[in-house]
Amino acid sequence: MRRLRFSPRSSFARTLLLIVTLLFASLVTTYLVVLNFAILPSLQQFNKVLAYEVRMLMTDKLQLEDGTQLVVPPAFRREIYRELGISLYSNEAAEEAGLRWAQHYEFLSHQMAQQLGGPTEVRVEVNKSSPVVWLKTWLSPNIWVRVPLTEIHQGDFSPLFRYTLAIMLLAIGGAWLFIRIQNRPLVDLEHAALQVGKGIIPPPLREYGASEVRSVTRAFNHMAAGVKQLADDRTLLMAGVSHDLRTPLTRIRLATEMMSEQDGYLAESINKDIEECNAIIEQFIDYLRTGQEMPMEMADLNAVLGEVIAAESGYEREIETALYPGSIEVKMHPLSIKRAVANMVVNAARYGNGWIKVSSGTEPNRAWFQVEDDGPGIAPEQRKHLFQPFVRGDSARTISGTGLGLAIVQRIVDNHNGMLELGTSERGGLSIRAWLPVPVTRAQGTTKEG
């Protein structure tokens, strides 16, 4: 089933929309009930009384219920005119007295015609003081009867409208506040889940709200505690394995130093293997370390890139640069970003053919740095798996490595609320670009400079 294009996504918006819809439906239903069972019967009764008044004023005789004909004296009719404020006008005089501004109502004319027994036209004039009813009956087709409704004032409807609007706004405001309170535990749960996704275990959440939400929060706290225990056990295990492995490696290195000069080539080969083992162990430790919470600070991204370029460049490796002119202030953990850039450069050196390019730049609200190589590249269908631990591309299977370098980069960038993007370099190799968020003030300034 397709979701409506403009349907709200969040539970807060959906619940608020549901309450507002139900409130509106309740108001419409109340209006229809009052209209059909109170207003329309009262209006019919009003028309009936008004019809009797008009008939009494327009005829000399009235027929009573028992059939007796009653003669209405002219003086009595004039007294009724005066008491009720009724006036008689010719067609031209009625136009000048306000008939031109009166609105014709077909249903009132139809009901009045039924009461008077002949064609009747009813118009209603709404002025600043009170409404006025104009009638022209078949009894006197050239005379308009003006009946002011002095007991009904236009201002009487304003409080009713204000009270109805106030009740509706109070109901919507109360619903909004209630839903906000109900959704607050879910917002806390969302933030905590995002932290767990980054490898940061938050403190146990406070269990409050509805019983279902409390149950979910309790289950989440149990899950987070289990994840933390698992992460701690893993870190302890890797630390123990690292210590236990480096001890025999150190003894092997000491043994190679006591080998004779004739076995120098063998000692050099053994030392290379020892260095590779140490590098693998260090990568495991780095991978575990990146899951921990890191203190952030404002730092210049270009300065961090420059330190890595200076450290990784040498007589065996030339790194081409295309850095953004000026500084790029980013909220980051400089040591972690330095580790990520170094891993990207080492990856480019290991799988490329000697050419490496490091560049940086800015866009509105974010900055980026990029490392390119001229190696065989990675097929597009394999790129989405490249950041998973221990996963390596087909072209890298013949080269030694753990498959953790880019996984470490991914973790570091995720901890900075950034994202990674793989592409093809200008020389056909692999291009890795990391995006980092930039404070709004800095992003606006960067846009002007660029």
From Swiss-Prot:
Activity modulation notes: Activity is modulated by MzrA. In the presence of 0.2 M NaCl, 2.0 mM sodium cholate (bile salts) decreases expression from the ompC promoter; how this is mediated is unknown. Autophosphorylation is inhibited by the angucycline antibiotic waldiomycin in a non-competitive manner; waldiomycin prevents dimerization of the cytoplasmic domain and autophosphorylation.
Null mutant phenotype: No expression of OmpC or OmpF during growth at 0% sucrose, low expression of OmpF at 15% sucrose. Single deletion of envZ has no OmpC or OmpF at 0% sucrose, low levels of OmpC and very low levels of OmpF at 15% sucrose. Deletion of both ompR and envZ leads to loss of both OmpC and OmpF expression at 0% and 15% sucrose.
Phenotype when changing residue 193 to L: Promotes the formation of alpha-helical secondary structure of the HAMP domain
Consequence of substituting residue 347 to D: Loss of ATP binding; loss of autophosphorylation
A GO cellular component entry from the record: outer membrane-bounded periplasmic space
Post-translational modifications: Autophosphorylated. Incubation of isolated EnvZ C-terminal fragment (residues 180-450) with increasing levels of NaCl or sucrose increases its autophosphorylation.
Subunit structure: Homodimer. Interacts with MzrA.
Protein name, per record: Sensor histidine kinase EnvZ
Gene: envZ
